[in-house]
């Protein structure tokens, strides 16, 4: 059974498949059931928990962005400068709706939310609706 599907550009993200990225020599993913951050140094053969606190909410999407790792969570946009070991809030206002996924648009960040497409030219600190 398929769950919700969100579209970011041409990439489809199904909630039944965990979000996974390469960051340096590690694979980092969102655990498919727990919605926490895990990492692998064995090309995905085994996984270890990297961040399991609930203070950020449930993780939904990950995006490497410059020297940061950005995350969409159930509480908003969070960022990490430690490969996901710790997280700080970047944007938690509900004015954009619920964030679903992020995409690096070059000069701006793009975000699909429950209220439509938004963009940010401030690394996700503020958002404007794309018209």
Feature annotation, model-predicted:
Residues 18-20, 56-64, 96-105:
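Repeated scaffold domains used in trafficking and secretory/extracellular systems
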Residues 21-29, 68-71, 107-111:
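Entry beta-strands of beta-propeller and related beta-repeat scaffolds
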Residues 34-37, 75-78, 115-118:
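Loop/turn residues immediately N-terminal
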Residues 51-55, 91-94:
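Surface loop/turn motifs at the tips and blade-to-blade linkers of beta-strand repeat domains
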